[in-house]
Amino acid sequence: MAEVTTVTGMILSAMPVGEYDRRLVILTKEYGKITVFAKGARKPNSALIGVTRSFIFGTFEVYRGRDSYTMYKASAKEYFENVVNDLNAVCYACYFAEIADYYGRENLDASEMINLLYITLKALGRGAVSHELIRFIYEIRMIAVNGECPDFFTCHECGREDNLYVYSYSRNGLCCKNCATNVYDGITLSGSTVYTLQYICLLYTSPSPRDISGS
């Protein structure tokens, strides 16, 4: 057997393969997005049956094959039970996982995306914030992490950093009061909205020790 490697990450999706196996897509801190086969994981007496479903965060012992990995052992640190037991929340979680899957690449550092997904699912499970608001924050932060966020800090036309209050789709950013007259597709935003967008883009997404412990 090839050398066993331990990775930390979150299972984005789990699909049945054959009679007893599962095909997993895991976003890992060490190797980015990887495909892992969990052999026999659907057998009733398998040690992997409870730790190879979507949204499980933990450590996974895997060994690499030519095109994919095979799971040897897994240890779950967070099951997100409050999410998977709520139909509405799990629908949002699936959407968030799809976005992470879209941006994830093998051998690219995915630490910040994992942290973002982790604290987002935590927020979903707590239920203190509306799912729709969580979705908006996640979307903006995810595109910011991956370098695709609109410029919310300077005017697209003149570069000034104050009086920004018009968003333009065609310019993919904000325009100041003076330049807004040249914008045909502008949407007027309040100062608090602009500040919130800027804050989300700069948000530090590492989980707190309380979150990591799962308490």
Predicted regions and their residues:
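A residue-level signal for conserved active-site and pocket-lining positions in enzyme catalytic cores
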Residues: 96, 139, 172
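Small-residue-rich helix-loop
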Residues: 168-174
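Short metal-binding segments enriched for Cys and/or His
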Residues: 182-193
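Single conserved hydrophobic/aromatic residue that forms the stacking wall/gate
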Residues: 204-215
